[in-house]
Amino acid sequence: MNVFLSKYINGVDKKSRVTVPANYRAVLGKELFNGVIAYPSIRNNCIEVCGIAHIEKLRKMIETLDPYSEERDAFETMIFGEAVQLAFDGDGRIILPQSLMKHAGIEEQACFVGKGIIFEIWQPKNFEKYLSYAQNIAHEKRLTLRNAH
């Protein structure tokens, strides 16, 4: 399967290492880089994580904007300027930079949330709060999916 699914909570050690779920690593197995690209989410207080193929899609979308627009500059700064490549070690772990951990409020545990083409890393309690909000929105907007095909 080529999508990120499910939710996992893994511990973060004192060296800021955390294990990426095995099925997430399997989705990324076709990538040229043995790791992930992570950047601060511009939607939520979490870390967005993807492979190089998704970063290329974002690059193409951003390049459609006026090269001198505030929007393009902001997206380039927040996504590309803040992005880091994180290699997997032999145990499938990545080292989370302190700047990303601070953005997401992550300390001892990290909650991995599959979002299809990306996954997010949250502070677990913050994700539980967001999950309640997302459930309400999904319930209210459920009929929009019927017309999405």
Curated annotation (Swiss-Prot):
The keyword RNA-binding does not apply. Keywords: Cytoplasm, DNA-binding, Repeat, Transcription, Transcription regulation. InterPro entries: MraZ, MraZ_C, MraZ_dom, MraZ_N, MraZ_sf, SpoVT-AbrB_dom, SpoVT-AbrB_sf. One of its GO terms (biological process) is negative regulation of DNA-templated transcription initiation. The keyword Ribosomal protein does not apply. GO terms for cellular component: cytoplasm; nucleoid. Its main location: cytoplasm. Residues 7-54, 83-126 form the SpoVT-AbrB domain. It is found in: Cytoplasm, Nucleoid. One of its GO terms (molecular function) is DNA-binding transcription factor activity. It holds the Pfam family MraZ. NCBIfam families: PRK00326.2-1 (NF001475). HAMAP family: MraZ. Belongs to the MraZ family. Forms oligomers. This is Transcriptional regulator MraZ. The lineage of its organism: Bacteria, Pseudomonadati, Pseudomonadota, Alphaproteobacteria, Rickettsiales. The gene is mraZ.
